[in-house]
Amino acid sequence: MSRDPILSLPWPDARPLPDTFFDRDALLVARELLGKVIRHRQGNLWLAARIIETEAYYLEEKGSHASLGYTEKRKALFLDGGHIYMYYARGGDSLNFSAGGPGNAVLIKSGHPWLDRISDHTALERMQSLNPDSQGRPREIGRLCAGQTLLCKAMGLKVPEWDAQRFDPQRLFVDDVGERPSQVIQAARLGIPKGRDEHLPYRFVDATFAAFCTRNPLRRGQVAGRDYHLLGHQDPHLQ
């Protein structure tokens, strides 16, 4: 059942994305998620991260989990847009949202801690305690959510709790805080095995935060037009 319109807000000016936002083409959803903020409630704290890197996946291409077929574990991919799909990657939790069309989804690849009156420095300290560095020290802010498993660890998001669930505005949702990237980088996805559509340009990065994503697409040796494309706010993305 659709939950539009959202009737139960956690605070008066919260703007949870409705299911209709997600129930669209995965590339469009992936790009437009940049700048949105994931909020997860832990006790009386709202942990928050701005989405800075996403990847789109489709049923009919070989890089997706859905291309391997329907299973109970993958059922969220085949539900309507706005369901949460979580799985384990390299031993850590990963967060995805189902998009329009069975089997299509968006992976939340990286985030950056978000601070405001709702999610303050106390919430940030909780995130750092959840995701310390290898020496047990607070991880620097720019690296705290710089990868799909680091993001989930810092946000306290776990597969058993959230896989195949819908958003809950009182516990976990994506907030539209009015931020829009001035430039977006489009490039090939990361970690796709050779021969499984690794060339498809289905990765999006907020250019302002390129240095804080999984792997900087603007690093030395990368060439515009060959390794990535830089899109302005009004520029159409590559299909």
Swiss-Prot record:
Q: Name one GO molecular function term.
A: alkylbase DNA N-glycosylase activity
Which UniProt keyword terms apply here? DNA damage, DNA repair, Hydrolase
Q: Name one Pfam family in it.
A: Pur_DNA_glyco
Q: Which InterPro entries match?
A: Formyl_transferase-like_C_sf, MPG, MPG_sf
Gene3D superfamilies per the UniProt record, alphabetical:
Methylpurine-DNA glycosylase (MPG)
Q: What class of enzyme is it?
A: hydrolase
Biological processes per GO annotation: base-excision repair
Tell me which family the UniProt entry assigns to this protein.
Answer: Belongs to the DNA glycosylase MPG family.
Q: What is this protein called?
A: Putative 3-methyladenine DNA glycosylase
Give the organism the record lists: Pseudomonas aeruginosa (strain LESB58)
